[in-house]
Amino acid sequence: MKKCAFVSDFDGTISKQDFY
C-alpha cells in the first residue's frame, strides 16, 4: 500500500513525500 506524508523541507516549505 502506498502512503503519503507531508513533511517540511529545510527552507520551511511543505512538500508531499511518497513512501512505501
Swiss-Prot record:
Pathway terms, separated by semicolons: Polyol metabolism; glycerol biosynthesis
Compartments where located: Cytoplasm
Any one Gene Ontology cellular component term annotated for this protein: cytoplasm
Keyword Metal-binding assigned: yes
One Gene Ontology term of the molecular function aspect: metal ion binding
Domain of life assignment: Bacteria
Top class in the EC scheme: hydrolase
Key word Metal-binding present: yes
Cofactor(s) named in the record: Mg(2+); Mn(2+)
Cofactor: record remark: Manganese is efficient to a lesser extent.
Chief localization: cytoplasm
pH-related activity note: Optimum pH is 7.1.
EC numbers on record: 3.1.3.-
Protein's GO biological process: glycerol biosynthetic process
Keywords tagged on the record: Cytoplasm, Hydrolase, Magnesium, Manganese, Metal-binding
Subunit field text: Monomer.
Name by which UniProt lists this protein: D-alpha-glycerophosphatase
Organism for this UniProt entry: Bacillus licheniformis
